[in-house]
Amino acid sequence: MLVYLAEYLTQFYTGFNVFSYVTFRAILGLMTALMFSLWWGPKMIERLQMLQIGQIVRNDGPESHFSKRGTPTMGGILILAGVFISVLLWGDLGSRYVWVVLFVLASFGLIGFIDDYRKVVRKDTKGLIAKWKYILQSLAALVIAFYLYASADMTGETQLVVPFFKDIMPQLGGFFIVLAYFTIVGSSNAVNLTDGLDGLAIMPTVMVAAAFALIAYLSGHVQFANYLHLPYLPGAGELVIVCTAIVGAGLGFLWFNTYPAQVFMGDVGSLSLGAALGAIAVLVRQEILLVIMGGVFVMETVSVILQVGSYKLRGQRIFRMAPIHHHYELKGWPEPRVIVRFWIISLFLVLLGLATLKLR
């Protein structure tokens, strides 16, 4: 929004031209989202406590989690508000890249809100029925997948980038829709499964978003894109604003979500942020790289699949409890140790993912 005002004011003072630079607006976007989260966080926590919107803890979970019962949840609203305000202020609202991610955040955030509302307000421990949750996620993801496929006017927009191989970028054709769908829905649910300990999901989300900010910047500049053998995507640089807004809002939320948490993000936060990472990966053609950089999310998801599959096929469990972070808790690891070690793994995987941009 302010881009257009600055563009108009440039005719009176050329210094306003600085707002045309994505990097400058990205920094402002990060700071805006961060300060918003820090400023409104205490107010939101107080409001959630007053409304008695508290976390419901399963009786069959780790005993250490019983003390979390009643902790304010649905704090993801704070993250989404910070991201939206920041992007609307500093982003180029004429960019379809921006609106695609905002649509994903809003639609998956609404699904998560309904799920949380049923759990904490209507006291329905199951929340939104899994079938309906999946249907709604699928509808939102397919809308984006079909839109991106139909609106693609450059070959790079529907190519698949394969890490480590600079000359392997096959055209996906109609399979683009399938890949985009599974990337968005899969990422959404993977982050949701990871969000089980204080700060466990938000920090890897911040790291992956920061990495995608760099990738979006490189993909939006023809010289960098050609040098690194990335698809050149004109206008993709605006995704930098979105990514840094997620980083800022996420760090601001972590201020209150770090152990012991004062607030949880709830499904309204985890489903929307996961879907946003998936959508950004699709937009910059880095679906495989998301699997690498978001390896912690993948690990958590695979642990659940293996646990359920093993129990149904053999009647035996592989882990003491799934997702896998609970397994380590039941082994006696203190919660902060599990969290920080998963953060370290996430940092390593993000750096590995960024290294693949050059290791081709």
UniProtKB/Swiss-Prot annotation:
Cofactor(s) listed: Mg(2+)
GO terms for cellular component: plasma membrane
Any one Gene Ontology BP term: cell wall organization
One Pfam match: Glycos_transf_4
Compartmental location: Cell inner membrane
Membrane topology: Multi-pass membrane protein
Catalytic activity: UDP-N-acetyl-alpha-D-muramoyl-L-alanyl-gamma-D-glutamyl-meso-2,6-diaminopimeloyl-D-alanyl-D-alanine + di-trans,octa-cis-undecaprenyl phosphate = di-trans,octa-cis-undecaprenyl diphospho-N-acetyl-alpha-D-muramoyl-L-alanyl-D-glutamyl-meso-2,6-diaminopimeloyl-D-alanyl-D-alanine + UMP
Principal cellular location given in the protein's record: membrane
EC number: 2.7.8.13
Pathway: Cell wall biogenesis; peptidoglycan biosynthesis
TM region(s), chain numbering: 21-41, 74-94, 97-117, 134-154, 168-188, 199-219, 236-256, 263-283, 288-308, 338-358
Coiled coil (residue ranges): none
Entry keywords, A to Z: Cell cycle, Cell division, Cell inner membrane, Cell membrane, Cell shape, Cell wall biogenesis/degradation, Magnesium, Membrane, Metal-binding, Peptidoglycan synthesis, Transferase, Transmembrane, Transmembrane helix
One term of GO molecular function: metal ion binding
Family from the record: Belongs to the glycosyltransferase 4 family. MraY subfamily.
Stated name of the protein: Phospho-N-acetylmuramoyl-pentapeptide-transferase
